[in-house]
Amino acid sequence: MMEWWNSLSPTVQVWLGGVLKASLILVWGLINFYLCLMLERKLSAWMQNRVGPWRVGLWGWIQPVADLIKLWVKEYIRPNNVDKWLYLIAPFIGFVSANLVWLIVPFGDKLIATDFEIGIIFIAAVMGYDVIATFMAGWGSNNKYSMLGAMRGAAQLISYEVTMVMAVIGVVMMAGSLRLSDIVLAQQQRGFLGWFLFPQIIGFIVYLIASLAELNRAPFDLAEAEQELVAGHHTEYSGFRWAMFMLAEYIHLAAWSAIAATLFLGGWSGPTLGQVAAGLGNVLNGFGAFTNPVGTAVLNWGLAISGSTILNWVAGVFWLVLKTYFFVFLAMWIRWTLPRVRIDQLMDLGWKFLLPVSMFNIFLTGTLRYLAVAFDGVPISIGSFTLRLLGWWL
């Protein structure tokens, strides 16, 4: 296989590699859509004391497939007075922008589709496509409810995009890089204590709230508030084109959760199978107090496989997916718990509270980074800095 690949010209290798990466990203996006949709339906049923889907497949786990087939075969109805091209293209722009985020998500050491040096800037650029898709859908539908939803959505997305980017700047300052893989490596120095969640707790909270608004998730789903706007910019869509918006929404949810896990929870960092086996072997051997044949065998096996790239990649994917779906669960929990806010409350929260708080976080991070030079140049949090300052003064 490698001989055949090496026999190809560099141009063909680039093209085939691009097609393979795009195909894998598309499949991964659809897998996340399936998992998120099923998890949403099960969690909502659990929180509302219902059973949820359980008839189609084992415990209802094929229900999302049945839903997609139903929407695929539904009659396509396009109103006569729509702007044809804007109306048709909008769902696909939203779907493509959702999948583009996965291009720069690192799943392991060198396990990444495209390791951009300006990964954070790429994320900010991709966010702009959501605004375009939302406004195109509202304008192209030529419907008052769609237009109102699109205007709300555009204002909301633009406002919270600024806040989200400002919240991430603190992480960039601590890592010293815009590359997501470098941000993960910067969090590996002290295990989970090195996660940026702790020194960047302010930025994390701001990012979490802003991402819910960016994803148009409750309690910030004002662009499609059913009680006010029928379905917002989705009003005139039906069948599979409506399903494209739903695909984009859930793929976006998983993608932004993966970004949060990468920025604040160490990304793919975590114990590998070899490290777990070696640790278990040390426990069975009493940490050197005595020798146990089983413990020695487990220890040697763990040390032997600790250098396996494939197993380390599997462990990286496992930890990233686990952390990602922690955020997915959190977003769904919030959706089915909190009531929807008003549009004026949403805008006030973004511009008058979250944006100033994120700017304060940048100032605080810069100050602590500057003062940390006096304490061996170690990135520090507010609490650890206070303790070190007291120790230095005393």
UniProtKB/Swiss-Prot annotation:
Its EC number is 7.1.1.-. It is found in: Cell membrane. It is an enzyme of class 7 (translocase). Keywords: Cell membrane, Membrane, NAD, Quinone, Translocase, Transmembrane, Transmembrane helix, Ubiquinone. It holds the Pfam family NADHdh. PANTHER family: NADH DEHYDROGENASE SUBUNIT 1, NADH-UBIQUINONE OXIDOREDUCTASE CHAIN 1. This is NADH-quinone oxidoreductase subunit H 2. It comes from Symbiobacterium thermophilum (strain DSM 24528 / JCM 14929 / IAM 14863 / T).
